[in-house]
């Protein structure tokens, strides 16, 4: 099947599976389907094995969001062309960068982005621990506001409800609020050993 893409590239062959669209490597489009699938730059796999067999970096455990090498100037230029065009046209005024600390070089990336964006207002979606500062070298206006909303939430929560919430926590987990740090650590380990196992191993 062919679909039109950018005018300068003409038409391209793609594989479609419901709403998934996969590019077809040049020169393989005339092969029988079972051979064609084996000759691509990717391997199709049953979705339930993704956590065990993934061989690329993902955004957490979201299989459709692959990490790309934005530290490579060509990759940066190609992946940011539309966003920077929208900024220059005044269609968007600011940028939000989700989880930049997952990048190979977050400081270098944010500096490069700030320069390419002409000093546009940029925020980083980074959830800071209560005693964690935003890295000084990041060229961002600040975070997207989770730390501020946490403080605002605290103003609106009645401290008298702590006993009832503690009882609910004990009912749901078998542990009390005093063990909160242990519960958090256990949850993090479950994620690392479960949905992120392919990235760790």
Q: Can you describe what each PLM-predicted range is?
A:
Residues 1-94, 100-201:
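Alpha-amylase-like alpha-glycosidases and glucanotransferases acting on alpha-linked glucans and related
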């Amino acid at each position: 099947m062919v679909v039109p893409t950018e005018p300068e590239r003409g038409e391209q062959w793609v594989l479609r599976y419901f709403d998934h669209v996969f590019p077809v490597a040049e020169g393989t489009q005339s092969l029988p389907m079972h051979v064609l699938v084996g000759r691509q730059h990717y391997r199709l796999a049953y979705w339930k094995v993704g956590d065990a067999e993934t061989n690329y970096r993902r955004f957490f455990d979201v299989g459709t969001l692959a990490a790309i090498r934005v530290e490579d100037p060509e990759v940066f230029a190609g992946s940011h062309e539309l966003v920077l065009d929208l900024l220059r046209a005044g269609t968007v005024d600011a940028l939000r960068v989700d989880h930049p600390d997952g990048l190979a070089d977050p400081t270098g990336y944010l500096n490069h982005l700030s320069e390419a964006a002409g000093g546009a207002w940029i925020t980083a979606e980074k959830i800071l621990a209560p005693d964690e500062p935003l890295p000084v070298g990041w060229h961002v206006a600040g975070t997207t506001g989770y730390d501020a909303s946490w403080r605002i939430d605290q103003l609106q929560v009645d401290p008298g409800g702590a006993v009832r919430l503690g009882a609910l926590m004990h009912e749901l987990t078998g542990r009390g609020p005093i063990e909160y740090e242990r519960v958090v650590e256990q949850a993090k380990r479950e994620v690392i050993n479960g949905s992120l196992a392919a990235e760790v191993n």
